Amino acid sequence: MVFYRSVSLLSKLRSRAVQQSNVSNSVRWLQVQTSSGLDLRSELVQELIPEQQDRLKKIKSDMKGSIGNITVDMVLGGMRGMTGLLWKPHYLDPDEGIRFRGLSIPECQKVLPAAKPGGEPLPEGLLWLLLTGKVPSKEQVNSIVSGIAESGIISLIIMYTTIDALPVTAHPMTQFATGVMALQVQSEFQKAYEKGIHKSKYWEPTYEDSMNLIAQVPLVAAYVYRRMYKNGDTIPKDESLDYGANFAHMLGFSSSEMHELLMRLYVTIHSDHEGGNVSAHTGHLVASALSDPYLSFAAALNGLAGPLHGLANQEVLLWIKSVVEECGENISKEQLKDYVWKTLNSGKVVPGFGHGVLRKTVPRYTCQREFAMKHLPEDPLFQLVSKLYEVFLLFLQNLAKLKPWPNVDAHSGVLLNYYGLTEARYYTVLFGVSRALGICSQLIWDRALGLPLERPKSVTMEWLENQCKKA
């Protein structure tokens, strides 16, 4: 199924300078390419993929050096800090946070097209950036919006029927992942592979599957929400709306804040976070076996559903509400510190704080905080989150084993709750819809670059003991 309308317009690339600040606050300039062609697929075919294929060949032939040492701590510590993945769209800096094709979140907010001046970036614009490395024009974004609106309904009836076979009480992520699996019957990659497509062309049906999947996951997610919480009364998509606004609309939220600001912001900042996190890595790993994007993304969703990954945004709001129930909304910072210690001493974590890579407060948190300060400064739960942030930084940041930096989950639940999406068990589904943009972008590049099957080596405890004796 062809997802985007072909528009044979390609013109010269132009570039413009976008100012960036690095960790030391000195100024540097990044050349951000833009283009006026409206066909995203043509952009990839005619220039970007051949260029990046040649670049990878050069790296393979010319650069044989080592990029780091593997320690026992890395092997026993979940491979944390071990460099071992090529990830095209993003880089996660421990101090600056995520960069989408070199652009920080504040920079994306400035240069990516919005629905109206001063609004949050349209997710379609981020998708163009992730796939091409170029900042799109509003016309290019509109072409993607139109493509999403024109996406067919193949397999949606199968998806609805499959989800309905589950108990309505099943966890939202169980229903969401099941629905995505049901969409797999329309896979263009599977059909092409069975017909013997040459491996150099693998990326083409992967592109079709990925774009159709991105278009359809909000339909799956909205169906799950309306089935669970609104008596199955579904709302059809509005083809005049963009990706984020349409998703909010199908959920049942019509406020401009939910459309214009919160959902677009949410989808953008949750789209990806480098390749080593559980969901992104799982999608890449499964796809390396030439599983199609539907199978790969469904696997990624199952990883996202874990409490140490995407389920954390659900756990944050539940934990905050437990604080209110036990201590009241007007809890002091000292009382809150005691409650944090109570949680930690019981062998649990405080959800929303600490990260495997990040070493400071980063834009994914601060942009949500700024949004809350502008739109809901008096909300009791937001004020409690603010106190919690201060408690971690003022009282707890000097503890050797504690990583106090807030992550993206620390704020999102409070914002969603304020605007009426109060069902915390559903929050990870929102995360999953967002993650489709980043994971599918990478899957297209995985196949375009011909990346191999992932197959690391494992060792036994005896092997490790012998290695330690030799050291």
From Swiss-Prot:
Cited SUPFAM superfamilies: Citrate synthase (SSF48256)
GO cellular component term of the entry, any: mitochondrial matrix
Pathway stated in the Swiss-Prot or TrEMBL entry: Carbohydrate metabolism; tricarboxylic acid cycle; isocitrate from oxaloacetate: step 1/2
Alphabetically ordered keywords of this record: Mitochondrion, Transferase, Transit peptide, Tricarboxylic acid cycle
EC number(s) stated in the UniProt entry for this protein: 2.3.3.16
Enzyme kind, highest EC tier: transferase
Catalytic residue positions: H309, H355, D409
Substrates-to-products reaction catalysed: oxaloacetate + acetyl-CoA + H2O = citrate + CoA + H(+)
Cellular compartments annotated: Mitochondrion matrix
Pfam families: Citrate_synt
Keyword Transit peptide: yes
GO terms, biological process: carbohydrate metabolic process; citrate metabolic process; tricarboxylic acid cycle
Domain of life: Eukaryota
Expression (tissue specificity): Ubiquitous.
GO molecular function annotations of the record: citrate (Si)-synthase activity
Principal cellular location given in the protein's record: mitochondrion
Family from the record: Belongs to the citrate synthase family.
Assembly and binders: Homodimer.
Additional observations: Citrate synthase is found in nearly all cells capable of oxidative metabolism.
PANTHER family attached to this UniProt entry: CITRATE SYNTHASE (PTHR11739), CITRATE SYNTHASE, MITOCHONDRIAL (PTHR11739:SF8)
Protein name: Citrate synthase, mitochondrial
Classification of source organism: Eukaryota, Viridiplantae, Streptophyta, Embryophyta, Tracheophyta
